[in-house]
Amino acid sequence: MAPKRKQPYTEEGIDFKFTQFQIVPPINQKNFYTEYLKRDDQMYIWRDSAGEKDAKETESESANGDTKQDDSKKSQVEEEEDGIEESELGEEKDNKTIVLHIGSQNLRIGLASNKTPTTVPMVIARKMRAPFAQERCLLKDICHVNEDGNVAFDSEFDSNLKLLDSELKSWLKAQKKRSVPNGTQLVKNYNKISKPETVPPDDDPEKPDWIHFEQDDHVDVICGKEAFLLPLNEYPEYKLFYPIKSGVFNESDYASSQQLLADIYEIFKYSITSLLQIPVSQLSQYSVIFIVPDLYDRVYVEKILDILFFDLHFGKAAIVQESLCTSFGAGMSAACVVDMGAQKTSISCVEEGVVVPNSRIKINYGGDDITLLFMKLLMRSHFPYQDIDLKTPYDWSLANALKIKYCGLSEATYNVQLNSFFSRTPDKGTRKFTFKSLDETMLAPLGFFRPDIFENENKLHDRYTLFPVPVDVYDNQPNNPESLAQTTLLQISTPISNIKANGKDDEEKKEESDLVTPSVKFKPPRVVYCGSLAAPEIKNEKLIYPLDDAINQSIFSACDGNLSDEKAKNLYSSILIVGGAGQFPGFAHLLEERIHSKRANIPTISVIPPPRSMDAQFVAWKGACIYNRIRIVSELWIKNSDWKMLGSRVLQYKTLGYFWTG
């Protein structure tokens, strides 16, 4: 018989629980609710900002010894803080804020307290391991003499030039301007016999101070304007790199993404330390305002912010859209902003301090295309400087200077004109040329309205070869910002053979494109109805479209197709032209006429120049300085610690108007 089991000894009157954990009852799914991360004040970035604000208020109260402030006085102080900050605090803040505006050709950088920014060319000269043959672009090598004895380029260029020439003649006829008899032949005959005149070095006050190194004293990197003063024929081991192209990374000239980002870092560092005289060790005490394009590239913005935070160690940063800064700089609350840069043109409508998302358009042409077109037109007239090489920085600067000095759209200048210029090269010294021109100075700016004449084949052809396409983490689809106006123009201006089909390799697409041979050139309608349009999956994002039609499409999309609305009238009466590419004499008047001819039902169409006291290229930069004074910007600063912890996720909460998507 088994022994009896002993009972555990329990002391009467002692009631201990076996555990201290509370038993959680089952959740009633019918009444389940939570507020976790459903309010902005629960986010880390907002809780962190609120904690800093409370700490400052506590410190201020303890310093003043006035802990009990009445409600009326407190509300009065809050109302005063809603406007512009006091002058003393604002000036101190401006002295610690750097405004950064990156362009395809130049970098505008400076303290928010400065009147004008410092302009730094976005170029860097790097010493390569071995000498290499410099690229050349001689226009005389790509043109030929036809049967009539005239200089001509390819057939497509000549056909587009005939259309451009007929359009100019019809416009001059409407202005009751007579053509010059035998003017073209007079220009060619003079240019054929024009010879350069050598200028002694002592007689040239603007002689460039070319860089010459001592033996074994070469530097690895030269940034900014100094890179243009390097004689590449004497130092073939150096190569010029342009890290930004058409407002995005220039991936075609680089072998790796690290090299491209390193060049941008070197240009930033040179601009801040050498030109602004601010050591890198003190940048943690500074803030930076980064002006981003309206139709920005996510990878571009994120990589630039990585450089600002991780490499330069800025304390805080804020990003703001380009058109919004332009409206601030011009003092306009509503406008259609047309920013005409060196390699791209941006169009956006701003209303009440917010960029209308569906109105944003980016066109891939700019002032550089006008420069190249102008030089081609001069070569057709036997330009005396036949050896001009547009790949060298000094000859390209010369061509750009000729465009700025002589091009215009004023009918009063339509005549045979005698012009002169100085060519300064390191190998041939200074030479003076004289030449005559007739309609070349007017035909070149007209290219904005017939952009098919530009060289558009190789634009953005190496896009996304070094950096990945930004995609959404959930559906793995591209998530760069989209605009209905941009999508519309891409659909109606892209030939069917350029549309990329899913699941087809390059050989299959090539075979299909060989089968498609359109007999008639496709001419799309100028404006289409703004309905629900899905963006086509195209090979690249290149958009070439007439400027006046693009402006009409932008305003059309901003008003949801209702041109009779008061909003459309306000936008058409305030078309703001900024940037360096659209400041030709008479250009604004011609643009106004062309828009009015297609929008006759709009009573007032006005193309507004920038303020008189401000350079058209500095309006956006100056607007960012004004943005720095607005009280709300204190809530939009991204701290270095925020970026290190959250990365790009912080941008959707820290942008004015919440324009960052994803």
From Swiss-Prot:
Cell location: Nucleus
Bias (Acidic residues) ranges: 78-89
Main location: nucleus
Highest taxon of source: Eukaryota
Function statement: Probably involved in transcription regulation via its interaction with the INO80 complex, a chromatin remodeling complex. Exhibits low basal ATPase activity, and unable to polymerize. Strongly prefer nucleosomes and H3-H4 tetramers over H2A-H2B dimers, suggesting it may act as a nucleosome recognition module within the complex.
Family annotation (PANTHER family): ACTIN
Record-given protein name: Probable actin-related protein 8
Originating organism: Schizosaccharomyces pombe (strain 972 / ATCC 24843)
Upper taxonomic lineage: Eukaryota, Fungi, Dikarya, Ascomycota, Taphrinomycotina
